[in-house]
């Protein structure tokens, strides 16, 4: 039986969460091993995304693109609400840049641990501004998932100083970015949205670099990558981020933010894997317990929403409420 939109959205978001830590790993390597400023890394990441998406739009609107996908909707260069999507891109760019600054000084897993306040913020924002119903099962799943993430990374109290405020600020900006995606994404082509997200990100980070050069802020200065490994890593970041965030846009077009929020915790599983492969950090026993909790939380929400989608509509109730607005 074909999956409904909510289940498809959860599967898409789970896939995106598996990709994003690869970009974070590349960003940390560029700032620590190659001495690129985090702001310049962020600008390069969004510049690469802009190039890839622009070329994709040009190809899709060419004769070749129409032959490959006949009858499919084509992405456009200008969305229906350009200003809204510029603001969305500014939030995305600013949040990414701040996160890259934090990950330069903090361990990758610990930075992500602090950032994981984002699903909590998203649940609250979606309930207040979008009117999403947040039932107790979703609330409990989010809390349990956050506790599992803390077990994975084992953050110390020393992290909650001035530097720890950076991933918290990034989490707030990214939660707002996702909220706007949910509110204004309907009817927009995901590829077009990513083009304008990249544009807004480049403008925002570009302004920060200019200010950073004027005031001498090292993390916000302009550093030019070489044509070897540094450019390759930035290109990888652009490809991964484009694929992941197009997937995120589609997911949030299909399902409410309050349902998808717990699945953000799956990112910590992928981050743990990349931490082992790249930095030789192998999880201990307590971390494996946390990973199991995170996976179990996502599976619980997945199976529950699947059951709600398959539940038959009562006879005579032609206007029954959608399953995504039930008791959690």
Regions found by a protein language model. Give the residues of each.
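Transmembrane alpha-helices of multi-pass small-molecule transport proteins
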Residues: 34-94, 173-177, 197-215
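Helix-helix packing/entry segments at the starts of transmembrane helices
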Residues: 112-117, 184-200, 242-276
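Transmembrane alpha-helical segments that form core, pore/gating elements
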Residues: 21, 28, 38, 53, ...
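Loop-to-transmembrane alpha-helix entry segments
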Residues: 115, 131-151, 157, 161-164, ...
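Specific alpha-helical transmembrane segments that line the substrate/conduction pathway
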Residues: 40, 47, 100-130, 257-275
